[in-house]
Swiss-Prot record:
The protein, known as: Thioredoxin-dependent peroxide reductase, mitochondrial
Gene Ontology BP annotations: cell redox homeostasis; cellular response to oxidative stress; cellular response to reactive oxygen species; hydrogen peroxide catabolic process; maternal placenta development; mitochondrion organization; myeloid cell differentiation; negative regulation of apoptotic process
Protein encoded by which gene: Prdx3
Annotated Thioredoxin domain residues: 64-222
Self-association state and partner proteins as the record states: Homodimer; disulfide-linked, upon oxidation. 6 homodimers assemble to form a ring-like dodecamer. Interacts with NEK6. Interacts with LRRK2. Interacts with MAP3K13. Interacts with RPS6KC1 (via PX domain).
Keywords annotated in UniProt: Acetylation, Antioxidant, Cytoplasm, Disulfide bond, Endosome, Lipoprotein, Mitochondrion, Oxidoreductase, Palmitate, Peroxidase, Phosphoprotein, Redox-active center, Transit peptide
Residue positions of the active site: C109 (cysteine sulfenic acid (-soh) intermediate)
Length: 257
């Protein structure tokens, strides 16, 4: 009797979830591409509970980690208005901020990309390049760049936009929403030796700070150069800590007078 009741309870709970999953998958697959794109955009930006049932990331297959080498990537990018084949190897000897965004011609995404582009010179000043990645084609990237900012476009770009049309880069970096076929807002800081120093992932509706990755690159470089460590909210003007029980007291005595 208890077993039968348990099966009945499970079927009553499980059926709505599976029904939701099927309805989302079927409607997504059967619609034309443009309609499918609009459907995904509306659903993913609305934070509706159905999306939580349907979408899982690729992180269960592979999750890059801080201190590990970044997964190799290559693809076609838009660089200074031209198409160019690009790979991780092109950034040896430099820091790289590699950030993923869901789709071209959306809402939050252009605000992030434009903000990074406007700060490009500050990244270049610390030997760091910035590359934005989505599952759109390089043709879509170029069309978006050629769209005025007042119309939701990108305008002139000082950073690179990389195409991940096969979704393999997003998958390798563990940020791909498999069912939706788009990437979460993942951001990776990769050092000149190809090692991941930082990673973060935002849910779709919230954009990222541009100042924080720049601060982190400067902090990692300071540690490499000086051998001291950076406390919370460190900036280049802030005191740092000598990493030993005795020497660290100099910092703590200074900030806790």
């Amino acid at each position: 009797m208890a077993a039968a009741a348990g099966r009945l309870l499970w079927s009553s709970v499980a059926r709505p979830a599976s029904t939701i999953f099927r309805s989302i998958s079927a409607s997504t697959v059967l619609r034309p591409v443009a309609s499918r794109r609009t459907c995904l955009t509306d659903m993913l930006w609305s934070a509706c509970p159905q999306a939580k049932f349907a979408f899982s990331t690729s992180s269960s297959f592979h999750t890059p980690a801080v201190t590990q080498h970044a997964p190799h990537f290559k693809g076609t990018a838009v660089v200074n208005g031209e198409f160019k084949e690009l790979s991780l190897d092109d950034f040896k000897g430099k820091y790289l901020v590699l950030f993923f965004y869901p789709l071209d011609f959306t809402f939050v995404c252009p605000t992030e990309i434009v903000a990074f582009s406007d700060k490009a010179n500050e990244f270049h000043d610390v030997n760091c390049e910035v590359v934005a990645v989505s599952v759109d084609s390089h043709f879509s990237h170029l069309a978006w760049i050629n769209t005025p900012r007042k119309n939701g476009g990108l305008g002139h770009m000082n950073i690179t936009l990389l195409s991940d049309l096969t979704k393999q880069i997003s998958r390798d970096y563990g940020v791909l929403l498999e069912s939706a076929g788009i990437a979460l807002r993942g951001l990776f800081i990769i050092d000149p030796n190809g090692v991941i120093k930082h990673l973060s992932v935002n849910d779709l509706p919230v954009g990222r700070s541009v100042e924080e990755p720049l601060r982190l690159v400067k902090a990692f470089q300071f540690v490499e150069t000086h051998g001291e460590v950076c406390p919370a909210n460190w900036t280049p003007e802030s005191p740092t800590i000598k990493p030993s029980p005795t020497a660290s007291k100099e910092y703590f005595e200074k900030v806790h007078q």
